[in-house]
């Protein structure tokens, strides 16, 4: 059977949550036993988001095959079992790159290359390649309906309906129904105008997901259905929720998956939502909390660390804990402002995530030193592993000017330097060590205990590595190199001796990209466990101190 397509579009405003909506639909269909694949088309002209600022685009999600993609692919992988590749994320820039390459080769045989049919055909071909050996392909169109940039993609999905028919294509439109407090009522006009915009392009939506902060009444749903030409049951309340893991359950309650089955004429079992219900139950019924301090360069824009935050949530839920994140600006730890160090004193674990450039590095080193000297559980990822190595070289090995050649090309001690195969390469786009690489772990290490094996594969995104000329000296001082590539070329994991520090681990790869709510990543689960143990020790120590103050001789008899 050929795959059926669900096309997800958005209207009124951006950032309504199309990615989460698409992922939640995919999740529900998988629970019904269907095989699903997910795809995202972004209307910007960049070939990929790899060189875009985290402040503009947010996180860059890396797939096993090394593609640098939109953060929505992270939602897709966390909510479904789809194994995504570069075929699952396309941009206008990449589509045009393909077309121009073909034109230069002469593939178009001298024809005038135009948006229709050449651009739309390229888009449709990409959609069809991602729909092989699956029951349903869910395609999200980025941007907002009405934007000039999105028009070729909207036209392409209109043509897909013409080619494949109504039984094989479904249009899901996410829109906004705002509540106007002054008037005391929900307003449907933005939704009506958004659908009108879609209709003007030739698309009649089949299902409307109405983003709102309260449940839509039967009358409101009826009004939207009447003016937007959809069935009453196809007007769905996409209500704001406190936890994103509620979204699939909310959609199921509203009958979204049932409607998909009906419109696409699919036959499948009822979904088993037990495990998702358990996750949501844990979210709202934790036994305790854990506080993690994240020392980062982009902390004012949390989407820069989307997968990281979710992986910490997954690790916390595995221990039935509520996660509280303290975002610590790395540059703040370079100042004499005591409030930043006060933040460090109140966290149960410290994490330094990935990043690029010199800004904030000194603050990260100060935070890492605090974690090492005060025995606070530490987890360094990518840049966090590199800075941990630099801090150790400086403050334990006595290599005062130790640094990375990225931050100081003239440093006498290049503890971190550019990947050997990238020396002389000046282009930034797609030139890093990307994608899944094998790693061998040392038995008995924190990492090996967490994974339960000594052979793993993790995703990478970096252009600098640990300089093995310093390995022997730093190992003698107490730094353990517990993870390497199978051939020993690259250092992948460093740790402190477990007798010297309860939990101190840095990894060159990005484990957050493989964590899921139902399958928390072992390293995040271990880090949260160590952080909570540290919290318990701190609490007991504080209680003993308070008790000793209360029982001092001068207080007795008062």
Curated annotation (Swiss-Prot):
Looking up InterPro entries in the UniProt record yields: Class_I_gatase-like, CTP_synthase, CTP_synthase_N, GATASE, GATase1_CTP_Synthase, P-loop_NTPase
The EC code for this enzyme is: 6.3.4.2
Coiled-coil positions are: none
Nucleotide-binding recorded as keyword? yes
Q: Which GO terms describe its molecular function?
A: ATP binding; CTP synthase activity; glutaminase activity; identical protein binding; metal ion binding
Composition bias of kind Basic and acidic residues appears in 542-558
Its UniProt miscellaneous note says:
CTPSs have evolved a hybrid strategy for distinguishing between UTP and CTP. The overlapping regions of the product feedback inhibitory and substrate sites recognize a common feature in both compounds, the triphosphate moiety. To differentiate isosteric substrate and product pyrimidine rings, an additional pocket far from the expected kinase/ligase catalytic site, specifically recognizes the cytosine and ribose portions of the product inhibitor.
Recorded protein name is: CTP synthase
Q: What organism is recorded for this protein?
A: Koribacter versatilis (strain Ellin345)
Per the record, the gene is pyrG
């Amino acid at each position: 059977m050929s795959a059926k397509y669900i096309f997800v579009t958005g209207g009124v405003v951006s950032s309504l949550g199309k990615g989460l909506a698409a992922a939640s639909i995919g999740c529900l269909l998988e629970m019904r036993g269907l095989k699903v694949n997910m795809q995202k088309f972004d209307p910007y002209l960049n070939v990929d988001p790899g060189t875009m600022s985290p402040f503009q685009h947010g996180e860059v999600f890396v797939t096993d095959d090394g593609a640098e993609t939109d953060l929505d692919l992270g939602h897709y992988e966390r909510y479904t079992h789809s194994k995504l590749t570069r075929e699952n994320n396309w941009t206008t820039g990449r589509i045009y790159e393909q077309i121009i390459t073909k034109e230069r080769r002469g593939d178009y045989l001298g024809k005038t290359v135009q948006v229709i049919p050449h651009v739309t055909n390229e888009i449709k071909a990409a959609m069809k390649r991602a729909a092989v050996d699956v029951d349903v392909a869910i395609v999200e169109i980025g941007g907002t309906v009405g934007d000039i940039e999105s028009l070729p993609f909207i036209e392409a999905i209109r043509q897909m309906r013409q080619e494949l028919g109504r039984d094989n294509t479904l249009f899901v439109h996410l829109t906004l129904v705002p509540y106007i407090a002054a008037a005391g009522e929900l307003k449907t006009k933005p939704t009506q105008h958004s659908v009108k915009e879609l209709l003007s392009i030739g698309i009649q939506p089949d299902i409307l997901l109405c983003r709102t902060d309260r449940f839509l009444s039967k009358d409101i749903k009826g009004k939207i259905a009447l003016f937007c030409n959809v069935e009453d049951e196809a007007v769905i309340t996409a209500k704001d929720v406190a936890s994103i893991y509620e979204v699939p359950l909310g959609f199921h309650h509203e009958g979204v998956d049932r409607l998909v089955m009906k419109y696409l004429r699919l036959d499948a079992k009822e979904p088993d939502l037990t495990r998702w219900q358990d996750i949501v139950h844990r979210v709202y019924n934790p036994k305790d909390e854990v506080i993690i301090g994240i020392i980062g360069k982009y902390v004012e824009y949390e989407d820069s660390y989307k997968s990281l935050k979710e992986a910490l949530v997954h690790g916390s839920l595995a221990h039935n804990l509520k996660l509280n994140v303290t975002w610590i600006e790395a540059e703040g730890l370079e100042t004499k402002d005591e409030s930043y160090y006060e933040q460090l004193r109140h966290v149960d674990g410290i994490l330094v995530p990935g990043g690029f450039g010199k800004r904030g590095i000194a603050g990260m080193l100060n935070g890492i030193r605090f974690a090492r000297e005060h025995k606070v559980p530490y987890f360094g990822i990518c840049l966090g592993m590199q800075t941990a190595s630099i801090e150790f070289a400086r403050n334990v090995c006595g290599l005062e000017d130790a640094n990375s050649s990225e931050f100081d090309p003239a440093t006498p001690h290049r503890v971190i330097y550019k990947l050997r195969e990238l020396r002389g390469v000046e282009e930034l786009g797609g030139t890093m060590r990307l994608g899944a690489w094998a790693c061998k772990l040392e038995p008995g290490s924190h990492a090996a205990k967490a994974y339960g094996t000594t052979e793993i594969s993790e995703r990478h995104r970096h252009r600098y590595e640990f300089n093995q000329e310093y390995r022997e000296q730093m190992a003698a001082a107490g730094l353990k190199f517990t993870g390497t590539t199978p051939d020993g070329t690259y250092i992948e994991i460093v740790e402190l001796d477990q007798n010297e520090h309860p939990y101190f681990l840095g990894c060159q790869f990005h484990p957050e990209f493989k964590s899921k709510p139902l399958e928390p990543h072992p390293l995040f689960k271990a880090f949260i466990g160590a952080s909570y143990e540290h919290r318990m020790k701190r609490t007991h120590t504080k209680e003993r101190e308070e008790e000793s103050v209360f029982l001092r001789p001068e207080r007795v008899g008062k």
